[in-house]
Structures are given as C-alpha cells and as structure tokens.
C-alpha cells in the first residue's frame, strides 16, 4: 500500500525513493512485524487464555514433562498471520500477482489450522479435525493455487530444477501440478509435525523464510539470476518482502513461545507457515531446495512415516521410542531445551547447505 502510494513520488522525494528498493522494504517488514508482535502479543495471549479454559490439550502418552504445559493457550499463529499479512499489504507491490496468490494460500491454510485448533479446544482432546478432511482441504487450496499460477503465467514452466547441477532440470509436463500440490501440502504438514516443543519450529521456519527471501530476490533479478544460472522469474522479488515479514513475525512470536511457552502457535500457525513456504518454493522453482533448507522438517516427517509403517509391518514394534523424532530424544532423557537448541543448530546447517546450492553448480 505504501509502496503503491509513494510510487509516483519516487523520483521527487528521497524518502519515497527508499521504497523503490526491495531490500529497504524487507528490512522495514522485519521491524514492523517484530513491533506488532511485541505490542499485540500480550493482548492476544490474554484474550486466548480467557476463551480457552484448559488451553491446548496435552497428549497423555507424551513425555511427562509436557504435563506442565497444561493450560497454555493455542492459536498463537493468529499473531504471526496478522502481522505478516499487514506488513506485506503495507510494503509490497499490491499489483504483483504472486503476492496475492501467496497471501491467499497463507490465510487459507491458516483457516484450516484454526478449524483444527478450535475442534481440539472445544472437544478438549488432541485429535481435532480428521486427518483425511484436513488433507482434502489442503489439497483443494493447493490445486486452486496451482491453477491460478498456470492461468496467470503467460508461459507456465513445468520444469523441476535440480540443485548443485548446472542446467539440469526435469520436464514434468502437467504432472508438475500434482508435484506442486504434493510440495505445498507436504510442507504444510511437515512443519506441523515439527511444532511439538516450545520454540522448536519457530526458528527453523525463520531460517527457511530468510533463505527464501534471498532466493526470491535473486530469482526475480535478471542480472543475479543470469550470473548464478538460476531460472529467471520476473516479479518474484516482491516475495522477499513477504518472506522478511515471516522472519520478523516468527522472531516476535518466539519472544512468547520460548520455554516455558506462554502460547502455542497451534495448527493455525504451523499449517499456514508450512503452506506458505511450499507456495513460495513452487513460485520460485526451488522445490528441492526447500527440502534441503527445511531438512529438519523432512527428517521429522520421515520419522513419523517410518514409525507408522514399521509398527504396522511388525505388528507392534517401534523404531523410535516416540515419533516425531524430537519426542524420541525426550524419551531418552534429553531436556526439552537441549533438543530444541540442537535441532536449531541442525536447521542452520541445512539452510547453509541449501543456500550453497545457489552457487555450487
């Protein structure tokens, strides 16, 4: 909004000219989202606590230390969604189609998560909306997004770029749409599975969003994309502002979500954040890089899949003491803070590996 209002005055005002730069608007997005989180956080937490008598239901079969979390309100993802969307609407170019498509997906996945959180709180159990129902809704939203991208792009690309290899890409044809839906839905649920400890998912999400802020900027810049031999996709640079807003929102939320958490992001936050990261990776054609940068989410998801299939195949035996993987280490006696910080370190390593793929070819 501010960008569009100041655009006619860019050449006449030094201050207005600053808004011409994506980097300036991205930095401002981080500041705004952080400030909004600090200001609205206590108000939202108190409001959620007044509505939720028992807070988020805690699994009885989980680590014993989790029983101390009883009464902690959920749906804190509302704080992340509102601050991110507001900063994007203020600072991004509102004539950019990718901004609106991404915001549509972000909010839609947030609504699905809100429905799930609401069901958990009102029924006072941790099951919420049925898994198949959530997958169906996620699939429908992802399909709509893919159709919009196909329709709005004059020459939609169905190429899957392979990182670390020069000029290597796979033409998936219209199967790419199915693949893109899988990426978006998979990313949404992977982040959701990782969000099981205080602050655990928040920092890796911030690292991933920060990585894609850089990727969006490079892919949307003709000079940099040619130099790095990346697929040039015009107008994706504006997604840098949105990604920066996500970073600021997550850091602001971490202020209240650090152990012991005052609020949980819930599925409202995890499904929406995972979904928006998947959408951005599809738009920028860096789907595989998302799996690398967000490697922690992949590992957590793989641990659940392996646990379920092994349990069924062996009729009751388990690979891990408990899945997702972070609970396995808790069951081994690791303190929650140790699990969280070590997983943060792992996420930093994955982010660096993913970003190195931009140059190493």
From Swiss-Prot:
GO cellular component: plasma membrane
UniProt cofactor(s): Mg(2+)
Metal-binding is among the record's keywords: yes
Transmembrane residue ranges: 28-48, 74-94, 99-119, 133-153, 168-188, 203-223, 236-256, 263-283, 288-308, 338-358
Localization terms from the record: Cell inner membrane
Main location: membrane
GO molecular function: metal ion binding; phospho-N-acetylmuramoyl-pentapeptide-transferase activity; UDP-N-acetylmuramoyl-L-alanyl-D-glutamyl-meso-2,6-diaminopimelyl-D-alanyl-D-alanine:undecaprenyl-phosphate transferase activity
Signal peptide: none
InterPro entries, per database record: Glycosyl_transferase_4, PNAcMuramoyl-5peptid_Trfase, PNAcMuramoyl-5peptid_Trfase_CS
Membrane topology classification: Multi-pass membrane protein
Annotated pathway: Cell wall biogenesis; peptidoglycan biosynthesis
Catalytic activity: UDP-N-acetyl-alpha-D-muramoyl-L-alanyl-gamma-D-glutamyl-meso-2,6-diaminopimeloyl-D-alanyl-D-alanine + di-trans,octa-cis-undecaprenyl phosphate = di-trans,octa-cis-undecaprenyl diphospho-N-acetyl-alpha-D-muramoyl-L-alanyl-D-glutamyl-meso-2,6-diaminopimeloyl-D-alanyl-D-alanine + UMP
Top-level taxonomic group: Bacteria
UniProt keywords, alphabetically: Cell cycle, Cell division, Cell inner membrane, Cell membrane, Cell shape, Cell wall biogenesis/degradation, Magnesium, Membrane, Metal-binding, Peptidoglycan synthesis, Transferase, Transmembrane, Transmembrane helix
EC numbers for this chain: 2.7.8.13
Keyword Cell cycle: yes
GO BP annotation list: cell division; cell wall organization; peptidoglycan biosynthetic process; regulation of cell shape
Entry function: Catalyzes the initial step of the lipid cycle reactions in the biosynthesis of the cell wall peptidoglycan: transfers peptidoglycan precursor phospho-MurNAc-pentapeptide from UDP-MurNAc-pentapeptide onto the lipid carrier undecaprenyl phosphate, yielding undecaprenyl-pyrophosphoryl-MurNAc-pentapeptide, known as lipid I.
Family: Belongs to the glycosyltransferase 4 family. MraY subfamily.
Name the UniProt record assigns to this protein: Phospho-N-acetylmuramoyl-pentapeptide-transferase
Source organism (scientific name): Rickettsia conorii (strain ATCC VR-613 / Malish 7)
Lineage: Bacteria, Pseudomonadati, Pseudomonadota, Alphaproteobacteria, Rickettsiales
């Amino acid at each position: 909004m501010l960008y569009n209002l100041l655009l006619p005055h860019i050449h006449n005002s030094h201050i207005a000219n600053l808004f011409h730069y994506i980097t300036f608007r991205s930095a401002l997005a981080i500041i705004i989202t952080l400030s909004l989180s600090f200001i609205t956080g206590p108000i939202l937490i108190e409001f959620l606590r007044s509505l939720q008598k028992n807070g988020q239901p805690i699994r009885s079969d989980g680590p014993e230390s989790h029983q101390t979390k009883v009464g902690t309100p959920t749906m804190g993802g509302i704080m992340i969604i509102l601050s991110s969307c507001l900063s994007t609407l203020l600072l991004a170019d509102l004539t950019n189609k990718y901004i609106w498509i991404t915001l549509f997906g972000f909010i839609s996945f947030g609504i699905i998560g809100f429905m799930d959180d609401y069901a958990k709180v009102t029924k006072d159990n941790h099951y919420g909306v049925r898994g198949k129902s959530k997958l169906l809704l996620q699939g429908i939203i992802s399909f709509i997004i893919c159709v919009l991208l196909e329709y709005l792009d004059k020459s939609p690309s169905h190429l899957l770029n392979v990182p670390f290899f020069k000029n290597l890409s796979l033409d998936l044809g219209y199967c790419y749409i199915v693949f893109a839906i899988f990426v978006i839905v998979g990313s949404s649920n992977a982040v959701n599975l990782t969000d099981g400890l205080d602050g655990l998912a928040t920092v890796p999400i911030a690292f991933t969003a920060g990585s894609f802020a850089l990727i969006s900027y490079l892919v949307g810049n003709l000079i940099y994309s040619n130099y790095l031999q990346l697929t040039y996709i015009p107008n994706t640079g504006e997604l840098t502002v949105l990604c920066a807003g996500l970073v600021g929102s997550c850091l602001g939320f971490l202020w209240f979500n650090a152990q012991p958490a005052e609020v949980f992001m819930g599925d409202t936050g995890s499904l929406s954040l995972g979904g928006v990261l998947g959408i951005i990776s599809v738009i920028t054609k860096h789907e595989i890089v998302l799996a690398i940068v967000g490697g922690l989410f992949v590992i957590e998801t793989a641990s659940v899949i392996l646990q379920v299939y092994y349990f069924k195949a062996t009729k009751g035996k388990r690979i891990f003491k408990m899945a997702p993987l972070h609970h396995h280490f808790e069951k081994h006696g690791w303190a929650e803070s140790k699990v969280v910080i070590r997983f943060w370190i792992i996420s930093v390593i994955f982010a660096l590996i993913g970003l190195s793929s931009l140059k190493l070819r």
